[in-house]
């Protein structure tokens, strides 16, 4: 039982710390930079570039108001389910520390972006609750692809602008791929 309490505390700490880091960065960018402004952090390959994303990854959106509302509600539902699932599995003693940390990073990233959608429109006066935009700022235009390169020629290798929450989700999901054995072993044990 003691191990379950430690894992629960670990999950809560990872989520709280990651969400706080995400929100501090976003609020600083939102209040100190103009939309579209770029600041060089390291040369021309690590930039802060402030954009607001109304959709999901890479600016993909699902229509106007109804699409934004459905996206926000979907995000909330997924986070609710994942939170229930992770903490239930911790209580059952079914997850290792690495799996808990990585799952918590995914949850923290999702929560960080939900906070933007829920409240930023209201706080900054541009949209009602659930209709806010996600603040993105990290930009790594690593190198320019040659013009002859198929489809993406003349564009930067990594053109996405993203935020800390997106990084948490990505690192968490990639890391969880290495822990899939935990889930497979768990299923074998249940049969």
Which residue stretches match the model-derived regions?
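Alpha-helical transmembrane bundles and membrane-interface segments of multipass inner-membrane proteins
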Residues: 1-191
